[in-house]
């Protein structure tokens, strides 16, 4: 277990790791809102370091180029985890909270979500796919503001910025792009996607945390 290397000014003072989530890669099996299954076509990857996390969701309306991602830090206060969205591709840097029940295979998260100005109960089932002996969280700044978060865990590297997100998988020592989306309007040449990937490749990443 490593110590925090860098407490940035935009960090969450109350951030607190949840031991059962530290160093985990989780994939969502399903989501229910008001007991109805939703977002069946959406693939979700959640990588957790200690307090830093990334959550990348792609495939809305069965379009792999449509996504939502957020990243930040968690605060664990049994049985609840509060997720602080320090970066959110939808622009909403608030927080959300869920109560967790842990199982041998993963965890069940329940809470409330607002849809069309109505507060509704939700349930998400998460499958734990990996326990990593070493997970590293990095941050990139721009004008003393948090600009991007990257988490490296086993074969996976996931990056989130305000304008999009990317997931890379190590294939025999080569990082290959697995999924990417950008919030910028689609352009014929894919310039916004290329610009996003260039940014992730060239950003000045600083180690924020290891697990």
Predicted feature descriptions by range:
Residues 2-69, 82-211:
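Lipid interaction determinants
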């Amino acid at each position: 277990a490593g110590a925090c290397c860098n407490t940035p000014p935009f960090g969450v003072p109350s951030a607190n790791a949840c031991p059962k989530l530290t160093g985990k890669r989780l994939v969502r099996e399903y989501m229910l809102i008001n007991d109805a299954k939703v977002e069946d076509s959406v693939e979700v990857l959640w990588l957790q370091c200690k307090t830093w996390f990334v959550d990348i969701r792609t495939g809305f309306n069965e379009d792999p180029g449509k996504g939502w991602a957020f990243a930040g830090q968690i605060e664990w206060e049994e049985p609840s985890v509060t997720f602080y969205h320090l970066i959110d591709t939808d622009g909403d840097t608030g927080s959300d909270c869920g109560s967790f029940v842990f199982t041998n295979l993963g965890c069940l998260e329940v809470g409330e979500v607002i849809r069309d100005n109505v507060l509704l109960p939700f349930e998400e089932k998460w499958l734990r796919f990996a326990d990593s002996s070493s997970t590293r969280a990095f941050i990139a700044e721009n004008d003393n503001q948090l600009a991007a978060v990257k988490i490296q865990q086993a074969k996976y590297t996931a990056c989130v910025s305000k304008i999009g997100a990317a997931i890379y998988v190590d294939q025999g020592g080569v990082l290959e792009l697995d999924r990417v989306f950008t919030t910028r309007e689609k352009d014929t040449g894919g310039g916004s996607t290329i610009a996003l990937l260039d940014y992730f490749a060239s950003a000045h990443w600083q180690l924020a945390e290891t697990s």
